From Swiss-Prot:
One of its GO terms (molecular function) is rRNA binding. It is an enzyme of class 3 (hydrolase). PROSITE patterns: DNA_MISMATCH_REPAIR_2 (PS00486), SMR (PS50828). Keywords: ATP-binding, DNA-binding, Endonuclease, Hydrolase, Nuclease, Nucleotide-binding, RNA-binding, rRNA-binding. The gene is mutS2. The lineage of its organism: Bacteria, Bacillati, Bacillota, Bacilli, Lactobacillales. The keyword Lipid metabolism does not apply. This is Endonuclease MutS2. Residues 703-778 form the Smr domain. Its EC number is 3.1.-.-, 3.6.4.-. One of its GO terms (biological process) is mismatch repair. ATP binds at residues 328-335. Gene3D superfamilies: 3.30.1370.110, P-loop containing nucleotide triphosphate hydrolases. Belongs to the DNA mismatch repair MutS family. MutS2 subfamily.
Length: 778
């Protein structure tokens, strides 16, 4: 396709109108490279994709992909054995997340028959293992402590050192307060320092890091703090090195999959572009045209995409019609009509929807050529006529019967008689070689050519004789007529002068009268056609209303099913609460071992739905809807850490990737994140484990009950003790605070009646005092 016509038709500006509907950088890149093609099958495939995307939106009104960055350079760096940065890994993490979401979306897609898009969806791969590994980096770009045991250990040491440093500085701050210009801890060169009055600088031993502008204050790092800060600096260096090692390990995991990831990015970008085409089509009331088997075109209510509030026009370019000549004065809209045809054809051959009504038809041309506007070349010192003629010669040498040619003001810029003769000769050559051509001209001689010559048709732009303004209505089959006499008469020229002028051109006056009658007949035909179209639109609106009612009914039905599922869930929760009450009584008897009690509780939770609601179809549907799948993101309950499901094992057990570690989990040991029903389900009880640590006495854990209601605190405490017993923990810390003392007393009462608690008491004063209870288990 000739590049020049894309510039003349401002095709790049048309493509810019699709930008607001794109979500991915890959989709943007594909749009930027988009150009017209002459492969009919490929164009039809683009249109089929667009029609199938419309079908998807009927069922899923808010289908979206989410913003994706371009990862092509990152994949190239992986191929070159380079390690990715945190930002690059975040982009890959987002790509993996969107890939998994699109795979799940396609797996759940119903009531939509896909052919072209099916191949795209099915080629998208999900990588649950990689997705789980990249959970080690959160969305803010922070490498989580659970990314590796070494990083977690280093950060724990950093935290301890920082705490010790602050404590030491606070002690020095109190003792040396008299020597300080301000009672605060400052920072200089990455070190914690004290602002000491210059007159007392020798009273505070340490390293001077800075001095105030006035010289009255020096910033000293106390000697007692120097070694501690050096240890902290070394730990921070170790942290950076460990993060670098983790980034290297993550890059190594991604490296074998760089080609697949690059392919995923392209597939998602292409889906994004198809989605953008559909949204543009909806916003602009555009359509997917039919592709002709021959070279015929039919544009119904075609509009120019770059004009605000354009006038819609019909154009019929039959297969046996070679040339359309648009005659008439300037500023009537002839050039706009020419460009409207050109843009409709270029957009269609680029796989884009066109601004026209349904039923429009386009052809496929190997070449589209145009000579539009003033192409005068100052460098060649050519006149306007010479410039145009040079370009026309190039077009005539390149065009063939599979081409479309658009000429604006053919033959202009020279003697009118010679220009008209040249224009007719050029059009005749194109007619004889059967090359589809549309040309505009203001030469009246071409009207006769259009009437007398086979396979050539006249056309014009309508003019309002009352307002003396063009209407921009395209009148096919009607040559343009002169309005000079009417305009002169309405502007006040003496009637006898007008009549004398008309007498001088009596023949032309008769022709104009015939043309006027043709215009009137064309306008009446247009009105009848518009009435037919209005009836068709009413039918379409009725059809849409019926579909809308059906969809609303379907959605209402789904909401009722969801409501029933929630009610069923409440029944199950009540049953579970009653079972917890029974089991709490068993605790007091101490007849059962801890693991037997917990196992019995777990079995009761599993049996409750089947026993009480085994025949409830709504609940079955809800359970099926909430069932975990490979690739789902999860939260591991015991650790509060994110991961990804890799594979389903036997007995409802799952293999999961958590950071760089693989775990085997039961379904009740994790919860799904980002489920649609998450906001609607009743919140499940969860134990808030604040911290795990190791002591000489064996494993221990800590539970924080501050701010909890009585019932919630007791439920969490019960589950926490169960978990501690299962994990063979010998000692646990329960933080309840002091407050009104209600929770503290309830904790003591619970521990006294639990036969598996050997002893308990308040923590030492420096570890929480009466706000924390330490319990020994056995």
């Amino acid at each position: 396709m000739e590049k020049k016509i894309l510039e003349q038709l401002e095709f790049e500006k048309v493509k810019e109108q699709f930008w607001p509907y794109l979500q991915t950088e890959q989709g943007q890149l594909e749009l930027d490279l988009l150009e017209p093609i002459a492969n009919k099958d490929k164009i039809q495939a683009y249109f089929t994709e667009l029609e199938e995307m419309a079908a998807i939106f009927v069922e899923h009104h808010h289908f979206a992909l989410g913003g994706l960055s371009d990862v092509s350079e990152s994949m190239q760096r992986l191929d070159l054995e380079a390690d990715l940065s945190i930002q690059e890994l975040l982009a890959v993490k987002k790509l993996l997340q969107v890939s998994a979401e699109v795979c799940r979306f396609y797996a759940d897609l119903e009531n939509v028959d896909l052919v072209a898009l099916k191949a795209l969806f099915e080629k998208i791969e999900s990588f649950p293992s990689l997705q789980g590994s990249l959970q080690a980096i959160n969305d803010a770009g922070f490498v989580e402590g659970f990314a590796s045991p070494e990083l977690e250990s280093i950060r724990r040491q950093i935290s301890n050192k920082e705490h010790a440093s602050r404590q030491l500085l606070q002690d020095i701050l109190k003792k040396q307060a008299a020597y300080l210009s301000e009672s605060l801890i400052a920072s200089r060169n990455g070190r914690s320092v004290l602002p000491v009055k210059n007159t007392y600088r020798h009273k505070v031993a340490g390293v001077v890091h800075d001095m105030s502008a006035s010289g009255s204050t020096v910033y000293i790092e106390p000697r007692a703090l120097v070694s501690l800060n050096e240890e902290l600096t070394q730990l921070q260096t170790d942290e950076r090195h460990e993060i670098g090692r983790i980034l290297h390990e993550l890059s190594e995991q991604l490296r074998p999959h760089s080609r697949s990831l690059r392919n995923n990015a392209w597939l998602l970008g292409h889906l994004d572009l198809v989605r953008a085409k559909y949204l543009y089509m909806q916003a602009k009331q555009a359509t997917v045209p039919v592709i002709s088997d021959d070279k015929s075109l039919q544009l119904l209510n075609a509009r120019h995409p770059l004009i605000q509030n354009p006038v819609a026009n019909d154009l019929h370019f039959a297969n046996d019609l070679a040339v359309i000549v648009i005659t008439g004065p300037n500023t009537g809209g002839k050039t706009i009509m020419l460009k409207t045809l050109g843009l409709a054809q270029v957009m269609a051959q680029s796989g884009l929807p066109i601004l026209a009504d349904k039923g429009s038809r386009v052809a496929v041309f190997n070449g589209i050529y145009a000579d539009i506007g003033d192409e005068q070349s100052i460098e060649q010192s050519l006149s306007t006529f010479s410039s145009h003629m040079t370009h026309i010669v190039e077009i005539l040498n390149q065009a063939d019967s599979d081409s479309l040619i658009l000429f604006d003001e053919l033959g202009a810029g020279t003697d009118p008689q010679e220009g008209a003769s040249l224009a007719m000769a050029i059009l005749e050559q194109l007619r004889l070689t059967n090359i589809k051509t549309m040309a505009t001209t203001h030469y009246p001689e071409l009207k006769a050519y259009g009437i007398e010559t086979a396979y050539v048709e006249n056309a014009s732009m309508a003019f309002d004789n009352v307002s003396l303004k063009p209407t921009y209505r395209f009148m096919q089959g009607v040559p343009g007529r002169s309005n000079a006499f009417d305009i002169a008469r309405r502007l006040g020229l003496a009637e006898h002068i007008v009549k004398e002028a008309q007498a001088m051109t009596a023949t032309d006056h008769d022709v104009n009268r015939i043309i006027e009658q043709l215009e009137q007949q064309t306008l009446e035909s247009r009105k009848r056609l518009e009435h037919i179209k209005e009836v068709e639109q009413d039918n379409l609106k009725f059809n849409r209303a019926v579909k809308k009612l059906y969809n609303e009914f379907s959605h209402a039905k789904d909401k009722e099913l969801e409501k029933a599922a929630l009610e069923a869930r409440e029944i199950v929760d009540i049953a579970l609460a009653e079972s917890d009450s029974i089991l709490s009584q068993l605790h007091e008897k101490a007849e059962l071992k801890p693991h037997e009690i917990i196992e019995a509780k777990h079995r009761l939770k599993q049996l409750a739905p089947e026993q009480s609601l085994s025949q409830n179809k709504v609940l079955k549907k809800a359970k099926k809807w909430r069932a975990p799948r490979v690739g789902d993101d999860i939260i591991v309950t015991a650790y509060g850490q994110r991961g990804t499901l890799l594979a389903q094992l036997k007995d409802k057990r799952w293999e999961a990737q958590v950071g760089l570690i693989k775990l085997t989990l039961k379904e009740d040991e994790f919860s799904l994140v980002k489920l649609k029903e998450e906001a609607q389900q009743p919140k499940k009880r969860a134990v808030k484990v604040v911290k795990k640590a190791a002591t000489g006495k064996g494993p221990r854990a800590r539970l924080d009950l501050r701010g909890k209601r009585y019932e919630e605190a007791m439920q969490e405490l019960d589950a926490f003790i169960d978990q501690a017993l299962l994990n063979n923990m010998s000692q646990v810390d329960i933080i309840h605070g002091i407050g009104t003392g209600v929770i503290r007393e309830a904790v003591g009462k619970y521990l006294r009646r639990n036969k598996h608690v050997k002893s308990f008491g308040y923590a030492p004063q420096n570890a929480g005092g009466s706000g924390c209870t330490i319990a020994n288990l056995g």
